[in-house]
Amino acid sequence: MAVENVRLLKGVPLFAHFNEKELGAILKTAKERTFAPGEPIVREGEQTDIGFYLILEGQVEVKRGGRTLSKLGSGQFFGEMSLLDGAPRSADVLPTSSTTCLVLSNWDIKALIKTYPDIAMKIIAELARRLRQTDMALTE
């Protein structure tokens, strides 16, 4: 499962430019957690130190104000922004089936950055890329 998880992480844009050593460190730090259908993973407005979730198995719905915004499945992720800024959650995330996630807290990522400082620049570069895409989409 570890090799499979490295492949999954490598497929996440946030981690796409990480080397094997950095990905291995993330996998050693991250926790695997399983959620029952309907059990809230995160709640809109909630303040938490757990930031990033990578879905290993299962499916979730992302909802705001009771309205479904998106559905995510294996290999997809959520919570990457609060991993860095710790802001309250912008939506509810609820599993529609038994769902297993790889979970990375804000504290975990800060500890990893101390050991692997290049991680910070790689994360910043990806966030800048996403911000640029959003800016371009808004100006079109």
Question: Can you name each region flagged by the protein language model?
Answer:
Residues 5, 22-25, 89-90, 107-140:
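A small-molecule sensor/coupling module
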Residues 68-124:
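Cyclic-nucleotide recognition modules
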